[in-house]
Amino acid sequence: SYSSFLAPAAALTDYLETRPIASNLVSRFDRQFLMLEATALSYMISSSQHDIDFLMKIVDDLSQEKYPHDIEGGFLRAERHARKVLSVVKSIEDSIRVGKNLAYVQINSELPSSMVVNFVLGASGKPVALVYKTKEDINSCIISIRGSNECKVHLGRIVNNLSSTLSGSGGGHEKACGAVIPKEKFSEFISFRNDRCLDSQ
C-alpha cells in the first residue's frame, strides 16, 4: 500500500535501510523502483529549499498518495539538481585531501555539504569522508561526514563527543552524521589524535 512507501523511502535516503524494521519494509518493494523514487524525491526537496510553493506542492501530492514520479515538474528539478551536484563534485576533485582513513574537502557552493560527501567517499576510497563549508555570519564550519562499510566506528558518537569538546555541536547515525563547529577549531577537529579521532581507526 502507499502508506508503506514513505517509510522505506525515507530509510533509504537516511542510510537506515539495514535496520530490522526498515529492512523489512524495503524488502516489500522492487529495490530499483524504491531507490529511484526515494532519490528523486530527496533531490526535489533539496533543490527547492527556497521555493515554498513547490515544497507545499510536494506535501499536497504526497498526501494525495501520488508517487514522486507523478509530481509535475519534479523529475525535471531532480535532473537539474543532479547536474548541479555533479558540477560541484568535478570542481573539487583535485582539492580532496587524504589522511590515513579520512578524506576531506571544502566546498564553496550553495549546495549543502551533505549532497557532495558521498562522492568524496567513493572517489577517495577511504573509510570516512568529510565535506565542509564555512558560514562567515556565524564564524563556523558546517560539516557532513559519511562512512563506508569499512568504517568500524560509530561516527555519530565520535562526532558528538568531538564537536562538544571543541565548543560545537554534532552527531548522527553510525555511518552518516554532521557537525557545526567554530571555524578556528576545524584543524583541531581533523587532527584530534585519540580514541574519538576520525582518522585513527
Set out the residue ranges of the language-model regions.
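Glycine-rich, acidic loop segments that terminate in or are immediately followed by a histidine
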Residues: N101-Q201
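A structured phosphate/pyrophosphate-recognition subdomain
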Residues: S1-K100, Q106-I107, L111, V120-S124, ...
